[in-house]
């Protein structure tokens, strides 16, 4: 069995923010040195975030490096409005990326967000097909597995698939295994990561927090086995140390969720910053960069 492993730029977001000279080429070189076969790159802001700018020369330079070293590319954005998606599909095409990850940024109830997202994606899938780019819609702290599946089935286009994130269903209080079961036939790519739960008394509100892979409570082995049995052969490693997100308002615990136990077990304080950071301002940029690399290596070699 041959499995392609790639790494997400969010794994080193403090490097991009604080380490002088660290850019998309530096990231690709590091990924290659760690034996990853490709990268996922966040372009999730007006200046294309971890690409570092919108210049065509910058895009061509990264594409040339990746093609020279036979590395794959997936790019990330957010939002589903047709004008934005058209722009990003064309950026993906120029960069040589075969997939474009996005998630909804609509407001409202889950039903309202779902309807607006379906309407957007019905417009843009034709262009995705013309450019030979697969749109992967992520379970990004907003939809349950069944809600995400409904979107994809209603759009019903071969260029729209699902990106399954190992832990993001927790933000809507859905068990990761239940979420995966709902979307499994439509999963095209994944974000492999690890999480713990933090009590409201310790974080100000009930919170999901990222830790080095292997040091959290997600059922990594069981989730990975399900995906491999389904036939998935491409996994994106995402170190989410120092990331945290609250439980979404209005969500109630779904089937299989027992707060404080199992996958939703709480991590007790005091928190070792090598494992968990909730307040970035408590550490210098240099310390964040150092701790981030240590967390990446601990997860990579776990």
Which residues does each predicted region cover?
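Histidine-acidic metal/acid-base catalytic patches
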Residues: 1-18, 29-32, 145-160, 170-302
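Catalytic domains of carbohydrate-active enzymes, especially glycoside hydrolases
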Residues: 23-45, 95-99
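Glycine-rich, proline-tolerant flexible connector loops at the mouths of alpha/beta enzymes
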Residues: 37-64, 108-109
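Charged helix-capping and loop-helix junction motifs
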Residues: 20-25, 54-61, 114-122, 173-182, ...
